[in-house]
């Protein structure tokens, strides 16, 4: 077939070369954005008198038809037409005649594809924000049900201090809230229009870029045409934000995997989110959590891939930029899928409160409570720390825990110890007392939950 740009050429490329250079296999995902951008563009052309109202109306009717066909997956794309832009233009001309060729007046594929991707990411980022808010709501529900569920808190994967399971869950709520904030902030930079920048230098036609931007729901336009067609910062920022979100999901999944193991038994995954073994009949594997953890590397790879593409590109457009889309599409699909799986997995998991409670009575995570007890009676904390360290050593040598140590032994270590010490050693009491702002104390958790509910419910409307 003859190319829409073929006037300069005397030879046709081999089929395998065309296939290598074509992007229609993946950029067809931009079909609705491409058509909507074209409708706005031709509307502006008519307003400015660059095409007649009759021509614009005919073009818009043709584009609306193609948009409806696209929604029903009835469009047949061809490699020969290279990309989504030329495929749509070719179909339009075939449907309405040569007047369809006027659509591209005052526009280049360079600003056209940039516009498509801005429209695409604007929609997808809003979808991801909503899905993240839905996951946050699930976290709030689990936290509400586990305010007084006591578990070990960890540092270095060693039991450190008793905490509320709700407090642990809410830590991920606030990580996700930062992710939401980053996505929301990125919309400022996504929601600007490159349309009308042309190939790189603008156009000689008297276009109205602000008008077409307004028609597409953009808040403004790029101030520099070179920047407009070569900028991919908005995609990189999306990939970076998504990498951080996936990192948070991966960290949580790592804990879910550990907690569901026989060594911990803190939770049990629903059968819906686990699989078995082809050889070992007893196995219940946390495959969905493992997949989310694994897919995090995939999103990181998409970020570093585009950073590497961009690092050596001179202004303005280069064909290298064709490599900006597949990683973007893949990241959107991956993040959306992981968020939905994560929400279902957490919502349906069973919390083994008894096992968590046993864990904090069979360790030394209450040692800090004794040090604080001595410090509250006027002993310098460093001296208190030394005394408690010796107590822990004594216990490990005897094969007992701090609650098992008789008061006489405590008094041998320090005369400040009294009978009320044993109240301090209770994991429940230890958690309750940590009532500083942002701490694991029950009053603080109630406050945190109220704030978290407002942030989650405000968006998803429950």
From Swiss-Prot:
<protein>
    <recommendedName>
        <fullName>Argininosuccinate lyase</fullName>
        <ecNumber>4.3.2.1</ecNumber>
    </recommendedName>
</protein>
<keyword id="KW-0055">Arginine biosynthesis</keyword>
<dbReference type="GO" id="GO:0005829">
    <property type="term" value="C:cytosol"/>
</dbReference>
<comment type="similarity">
    <text>Belongs to the lyase 1 family. Argininosuccinate lyase subfamily.</text>
</comment>
<dbReference type="GO" id="GO:0004056">
    <property type="term" value="F:argininosuccinate lyase activity"/>
</dbReference>
<keyword id="KW-0028">Amino-acid biosynthesis</keyword>
<dbReference type="InterPro" id="IPR022761">
    <property type="entry name" value="Fumarate_lyase_N"/>
</dbReference>
<keyword id="KW-0456">Lyase</keyword>
<dbReference type="Pfam" id="PF00206">
    <property type="entry name" value="Lyase_1"/>
</dbReference>
<dbReference type="InterPro" id="IPR020557">
    <property type="entry name" value="Fumarate_lyase_CS"/>
</dbReference>
<dbReference type="InterPro" id="IPR029419">
    <property type="entry name" value="Arg_succ_lyase_C"/>
</dbReference>
<dbReference type="GO" id="GO:0042450">
    <property type="term" value="P:arginine biosynthetic process via ornithine"/>
</dbReference>
<dbReference type="InterPro" id="IPR008948">
    <property type="entry name" value="L-Aspartase-like"/>
</dbReference>
<dbReference type="InterPro" id="IPR009049">
    <property type="entry name" value="Argininosuccinate_lyase"/>
</dbReference>
<dbReference type="GO" id="GO:0006526">
    <property type="term" value="P:L-arginine biosynthetic process"/>
</dbReference>
<keyword id="KW-0963">Cytoplasm</keyword>
<dbReference type="InterPro" id="IPR000362">
    <property type="entry name" value="Fumarate_lyase_fam"/>
</dbReference>
<comment type="pathway">
    <text>Amino-acid biosynthesis; L-arginine biosynthesis; L-arginine from L-ornithine and carbamoyl phosphate: step 3/3.</text>
</comment>
<dbReference type="InterPro" id="IPR024083">
    <property type="entry name" value="Fumarase/histidase_N"/>
</dbReference>
<dbReference type="Pfam" id="PF14698">
    <property type="entry name" value="ASL_C2"/>
</dbReference>
